[in-house]
Every structure is written in structure tokens, then in C-alpha cells.
Amino acid sequence: MLKSVERCLECKTDRSFGNHGTWWSMPCTGDIIQYFTYHGNVICRVNWTQKTVYLTNSGWDTRSTNRALNDYKHWFTENTDFEIIDKREN
């Protein structure tokens, strides 16, 4: 797993690590949502309240983007019972 992805997964605050980043949101719905970015594009959105993980390559079908997405998918599959919604574009 990429070290920057591991760091993002461990973060409890908004933070960037090179081309990777994470930030948190609590919209009016009361859901706790964490966003993971790669080169400024949201590639993974986690709703901690509804236990869902939404993956998208944001139109960037590159090996590096897919590697980061696979790392997020692997971590959430192995460590949670969250529903994974994979919406990668080809």
C-alpha cells in the first residue's frame, strides 16, 4: 500500500501528503463524510455514518490513480464492513 494512502487513512483532520490528501465534511444531513483526493481530484468518498465507500477515477483512467483506488478499496474491504461502490470510468 502507498505510504501516502496509509497516512490519509490515519488522518483525523484535513491534510495533504504530496499528491494525496484528505478532508472531512459534516453536511446538514448529519453524515460524517471523508474525502480522499489524488492530484486535487476526489477519488474516494467515505460516508462513515451510512458505511459506504464511493470510488471514482474522476475520468483519469491511469495506472497511478487506479493503484490509489485499489489501495483504498483493499483497506476498506479488509478493515470494515462498509459497502463498496466502484464507479470507475474507462
Language-model regions, residue ranges each:
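Terminal leader/tail segments of proteins
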Residues: M1-N90
